[in-house]
Amino acid sequence: MPDVKESVPPKYPGDSEGRSCKPETSGPPQEDKSGSEDPPPFLSVTGLTETVNEVSKLSNKIGMNCDYYMEEKVLPPSSLEGKVKETVHNAFWDHLKEQLSATPPDFSCALELLKEIKEILLSLLLPRQNRLRIEIEEALDMDLLKQEAEHGALKVLYLSKYVLNMMALLCAPVRDEAVQKLENITDPVWLLRGIFQVLGRMKMDMVNYTIQSLQPHLQEHSIQYERAKFQELLNKQPSLLNHTTKWLTQAAGDLTMSPPTCPDTSDSSSVAGPSPNEAANNPEPLSPTMVLCQGFLNLLLWDLENEEFPETLLMDRTRLQELKSQLHQLTVMASVLLVASSFSGSVLFGSPQFVDKLKRITKSLLEDFHSRPEEAILTVSEQVSQEIHQSLKNMGLVALSSDNTASLMGQLQNIAKKENCVCSVIDQRIHLFLKCCLVLGVQRSLLDLPGGLTLIEAELAELGQKFVNLTHHNQQVFGPYYTEILKTLISPAQALETKVESV
């Protein structure tokens, strides 16, 4: 199964990474139809997770991300699998060279390759391209080619050049350069090898073009499919929504105790929420949408291995864990940048190049922060102070004194401590930003970033968009269930609305 990369693909046929010399057929994961026919009387969380996995993960990913596209997995050359694959492919192409160099030449492998090339070219055609279909069928008529091979008259190089011309007609603009490079190859074996490499990419381009074209239909299908599968489970076990109900009950309680606020874009000073007295005297009316937003935000603070994890989010548990890890990394990175900027000010941090370099260094050194926080942050403090010292020196400015350097390193190392005030403030502000993303959207939220977050704006935009995509898709799938639960949690006097609106 090809790996999935979430990014914006180009227009037809979309861009993708290279693949092996001989294309392999891959498709969406098959639904697991195993399991007993009679449902068990009780379904544990583990059992539920296994059952929910029956839902197509591919459908879920496509439905959640409108920029979804697929690419083949590129094996590291140093890996065992990569070495084995390269060895097998080299052996095949060496064998083909021996066959074509024999006297008389043996065209058996060449015929198989031409047959596969023909099938790939035909698969790249759109339904309306009948003229090209007929032309390919005639030019690569396998019966005729077999007769030529039997008489030793098969023109492999000539046929390869024809294939190249057809590829130039069918490929996306992003593949033009690769096809043009093949035109300079005169060795038939190397030419066929290159043809297969580029055709493999063109096949993936067509897959991504098809996904992009069908995106609206796939999204709607994904929503209906996931909801239907969940309803099947709910019919087997009526208590399936117990943990979801507890989760939303807690979110409603959090809002009742401390109503959430989100800065309005028209007032950049409204970063902080109302005071406790204002909140008590002027409680904001609850709405199902705000309760749900609070619930999603709470998940970023949860232990995601919690046995009472909401049933409606089990499919998203892994993605939530990734978002939580990314959020924590951004919290530490922003804290490092904020502390470092206080020692050099706008002199260095006014340079985007310097900030980007410092972010790259910090990010790479924080990879082990979760398992070895003190050691990781010590390395970060040494590298950051060294970069600041050297950059000031290169600009002809006064470098940090030994006292300032020691103070900088000390404050950076304190970031690894629990309840560090800088980290706590940054963490609260990132959560506030994510709340605003759910309410206002990512782009509007970026217009009014709280202090300390401007240096990680690009990273925040990526995090916010992933979070919005996840919550939006989940809400579209399970909205009817949430609406029914929230009716029991929000009294008519409290409610602003009676139905969950899309976040």
Curated annotation (Swiss-Prot):
Isoform 2 and isoform 3 are expressed in sperm. Isoform 1 is not detected in sperm (at protein level). Testis-specific. Isoform 1, isoform 2 and isoform 3 are expressed in sperm. It is found in: Membrane; Cell projection, Cilium, Flagellum; Cytoplasmic vesicle, Secretory vesicle, Acrosome. Keywords: Cell projection, Cilium, Cytoplasmic vesicle, Developmental protein, Differentiation, Flagellum, Membrane, Spermatogenesis, Transmembrane, Transmembrane helix. InterPro entries: Tcp11. The chain crosses the membrane at residues 330-349. One of its GO terms (cellular component) is acrosomal vesicle. Belongs to the TCP11 family. This is T-complex protein 11 homolog. It comes from Homo sapiens (Human).
